[in-house]
Amino acid sequence: MARSKATDPPADLLGPVQGEVSWFCCGTAWGPCSSTGKGACGTCNSGSLQHAWPNTSDACWSITRPDRCGVSLSRRTCGYRHRVTALCSGASVVTAIADCGPQTDLFCGERSCCGATCADNRLIDLTPAAYSQIASLSSGLRPVEISSA
């Protein structure tokens, strides 16, 4: 869901926001992922129900910049739990922040759809374990609603 230009620092997330979800690898090898770094929080693992959020710190925000896509997202730090609900199926998963990302400003206006149901802007990355709870990893991107758990 597009919001007006964000202020700096961004306004608090007043309710659910819609956007795209993708998936990423972190930590120990799992499924399609080889071993890699543990993410900005130092706890990220591909086999855990975790996610990356674009506003975990000032340093993170300076890289991801969802405000450049017209989206204002609240500051949430490591361990904060979000519920991610697939707009296509209604399936949802609760995950904890374990990394900074995605770099939203690289994907402004990007859109994913299932039929006539669409969402814009890549706002959250799930680990493969979490993403596979709401969609097939082969789908790559899906429209979702993100809310506090």
Language model features: what each stretch is:
Residues 2-149:
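Secreted/periplasmic proteins
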